[in-house]
């Protein structure tokens, strides 16, 4: 198995090649190191290699890692987010990638207003309309 540095170098090379093929600048793309279920020591090693954007899929795990890892990490919520957990991450995340309902968006807005912050989000759309998948239906989009 490749070590973390070799793996990161390979991913970076792949990103650079994809950017070149697409006529894009490397700076147009954000590499997010997905940290879910990984130990703190491993995340610190990855951080030491350069990445500053980390993705987490569980609020509690994200909050625990935020407490002990460097404060300049930009955290991304990449998993399903329950409305009762929004208050724990608003104002602490770079981007919420998985807003899958109007109800959730309204809760994010409510918590953001309480903290006087702006929250960047991505809306998750269930294009395939699969019942087992999260996301709003395409008819609900503007």
Predicted regions and their residues:
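Conserved alpha/beta-domain cores
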Residues: 1-142
